[in-house]
Amino acid sequence: MYGDTLLRSQFGKPSGLLFGPLPCLLCLGCFCLVSPSGLRAGPAEPHTSTDWRLKPSLKYDALCLLNAMSGDPYYLRYYQAEYDHFHPLFTPEELAAFQTLKHIIKDEGGGIVSATLALYYSVVDDETLPEIIRTARDSSAMEAALRKTSYWSNEGWRNYERAKPALQTALQALNRTGFPAYWKQTAQPRIERRIAQLSPDLPKYNIVPVIESYLGFPLPSQTVTVYLLAYSEPHGIRITGLRFLTHVSYPFQIVLHNAIHESMHPPYHADEPAMRQAIDLLSRDSLIVDKVKRHDPAFGYNTPSGYIEEDSVQALEQIVSERFGVERDARKYWQQQDGGMHVLAAAIYVEYKRSLSQVPQEYTKWFVHAVEDGYLRGDRLQTIVKEFFSEESLREAK
């Protein structure tokens, strides 16, 4: 419905290849498995190039704006003006619907309203608000499509079903009060300008083959689709396929980091027995339990498995970024990001990078052994984290 730009990475190979030629990647086998991309897939070949597609989306902007329309202070920091514009136009019933959405998905479910709904709606082709409302009224097609992905959760779907009446009312409220016209006038032109600014540089980064070399399996596509949004801040959100949502204001480096990061969710097959056992074992570690329990739930990562996945991806993001010369100051970043909760990412980064310098191997294989052998648990984990964030290390990094 809205214009998009497709670009291909044809150059810009990263320096310092750790693996040399791309390794033989893990075959998904003859069974009907769920790939980490979220799509059910059979065997696939590794990719050699990266296509970049940049798009605006009224659909995802509408779903992201639901965060702020509930009056959630966490999002009003970013969208007070939009809240002030629409809030007086809503009826009491509509205002209650926005708050009910937040209560069910965020307060009770421990999720993020925008991330949850964007993921679910990414499995259907809706683009306009009337289409989105129709799916909220009858979500059978969404359910059938979502069941075919690795993102399906019985509990998550039950929460969505509970939230559906409020979602329908909230979306109808946005439609009734003129959100589509508001978006086209205030958001779309800004997004189109930003797409034109980003387009020359993204093709320099051929990220897909490099990511695959660490994950050990092919991504679902060589096309990375970036939806630039006006109302997604402060999140970067992965949806099904090799697609993600990022904010129009983010500088180039953050957009690139978002692309690297979100393309790796999830970085392993969590349903494989060895990986499942390793995740369960690490989930019981006292440091992991403490970080999940004692952080602002608005950040997300409210379960041990979700926290482990996120920190795995953050560590891999740093390693991949170093290959392209666009890495962050890792110590400073993890000291500040989400209140400093991602200490596991720091430990994974240190230990996996050390292992790669000796015997290059796929992340899944390394992770399972690191957890089972105690390199990523207990006193050893505590020591790695303490040394990484020590005053001496911080001084050396400056």
List where the protein language model places each region:
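N-terminal secretory signal peptides that target proteins for export/translocation
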Residues: 1-19
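Bacterial N-terminal signal peptides
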Residues: 20-35
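N-terminal mature-domain "stem" immediately C-terminal to a signal peptide or N-terminal signal-anchor/transmembrane
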Residues: 42-138, 340-352, 357-364
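Active-site scaffold of zinc-dependent metalloenzymes
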Residues: 145-152, 208-212, 225-256
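Auxiliary, metal-adjacent structural segments of Zn-dependent hydrolase domains
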Residues: 182-238
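Active-site recognition of the HExxH zinc-binding catalytic motif
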Residues: 254-274
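Post-HEXXH active-site segment of zinc metalloproteases
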Residues: 270-297
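Pan-zinc metallopeptidase signature
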Residues: 315-398
